[in-house]
Amino acid sequence: AEVKSCISVSGNSEMLEAFELLKKALEDNNVENLEWGYRATFGGATVAMDCPPYEMYYSGSQIWQQTQDLADISGMYKAYGIAMEENATTTRWDHVAVELEFLHFLTYKLAYAIENHSEEEQESCRSGKKKFLYAHIGRWIKAFSTSVVKKTPEDFYRQAATLATIFVHKEMVRLSVDAEEIDEYMGNEPDYLQRLEGKSASACDSCMDEEKYD
């Protein structure tokens, strides 16, 4: 009810419609279906290569750029007081859920700063949001959403991806962020991520059973 109220106040009919569809998809569902739908869309023990939920798969960058981008993401989290695990080699800071949560965190901090008349904090949060939208989530959310809509058998994930894209793009317009967007996922598998995860990825875990990697 609170989320719907906030969207209604904004007067954004497109976002409100997307939220209502997401809400309905959740109400008509259960945990088992959502778990199955997640694995079918994003993979399980391995990443689904036709719909990865990680930024680095969409950038198609060289290894030096991949490590720099991941370091930049981690650095932004730390700059705003979010602690990262130092020794967890499998920690993925570029997961779409983590990046969207960070965007929510900055939005909340900005709202708090506005309410408490902190001009310096407002500028810090606004600047952080603009940078994160421009360099990270704003670049690949469209391609990610398109991949999800095409692949997922579960309407909940289709509507969630659609709502996320609408929200991110509305924020980009509001903050005058002109990111160089990736329109479509091209099936990249960055070398760095392959080594990070220990093996190549497939939409079907069983397909990986006989594959061996050094």
Task: Identify the residue ranges that each predicted region occupies.
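Surface/interface-facing alpha-helical segments and adjacent flexible terminal/loop regions used
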Residues: 1-214
